[in-house]
Amino acid sequence: MKQDFEIKLYEVVDHQKSADGTEKFLFRLQDGNLIESVLMRHNYGTSICVTSEVGCNMGCAFCASGMKKKLRNLSAGEMVLQLESVYEVIKEKISHIVVMGIGEPFDNYQNVINFLHIVNEPHGLEIGSRHISVSTCGLVPMIYEYAKEDLQSNLAISLHAPNNEIRDQIMPINKAYRIEELVKAISDYIIATNRRVTIEYILIDGLNDSIKCANELADLLHGLNVYINLIPYNEVKEKPFKRSKKEQMRKFYDTLKKRSMNVTCLLYTSPSPRDTERYRM
């Protein structure tokens, strides 16, 4: 692998370990820019959350990554080097990859696609496509492009709101692609690929966590082959948003279950390979 790309592994600027086995790596790139990669350990294996850009232009109001404007795309080789550099430290088999780190993967589309092919090929890392997930905040045209790719990797949508009014407040991309367009793209993707889509929904206190919002979300996604992942908000000191209270998260979760939605929240259910709560940086 190394001889196909840059030979020198990244310098580890910072390495933090959490009690749950999660490890965060701050790497210095060849040009001096810094990126993060996150290692998660699960009962089904070890996964790496890969960064696709230096900075991010999506500007999601709740996200720490969006505070740093995008400087450039990462190449496929630079994404592979994140895996190699993490492996050099942990010396453990990497079983799953999630492209959900800093940056919008579909804003660096071709490099991300090249990366997915590299890690999946027999002479690469040989990670099965179904053990790879890519997350987007909703670049609708690229969802249609992704559906055409010769890939079996998973798609996750960062939705975080059940309607345009709330999504407009926290996700600028919604001004370009309304929630109705996004849901149609999700539906068309499912039909084209026969694959389930993960819906990521961060629960923010007083903003998108009401019972009304839960019912709106169920109405919005009714009949679609989706898996809703409720994510307790990871508070950012520079942001005004707060994590939903546990009892409110429970009510939101229970409302969706009563509406027969396929839903999980790691506060209440056992993690599976499709869970993405711990993948969010």
Question: Where are the regions that the model predicts?
Answer:
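Canonical Radical SAM [4Fe-4S] cluster-binding loop centered on the CxxxCxxC motif
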Residues: 41-78
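Conserved small/polar residues in nucleotide/adenosyl-binding loops
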Residues: 268-275
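Hydrophobic alpha-helical segments, chiefly the membrane-spanning helices
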Residues: 279-281
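Flexible, acidic/Gly-rich N-terminal and inter-domain linker regions that tether
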Residues: 1-46
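Conserved AdoMet/S-adenosylmethionine-binding subsite of the radical SAM
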Residues: 87-88, 92-96, 101-259
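Conserved alpha-helical substructure of the radical SAM core
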Residues: 67-96
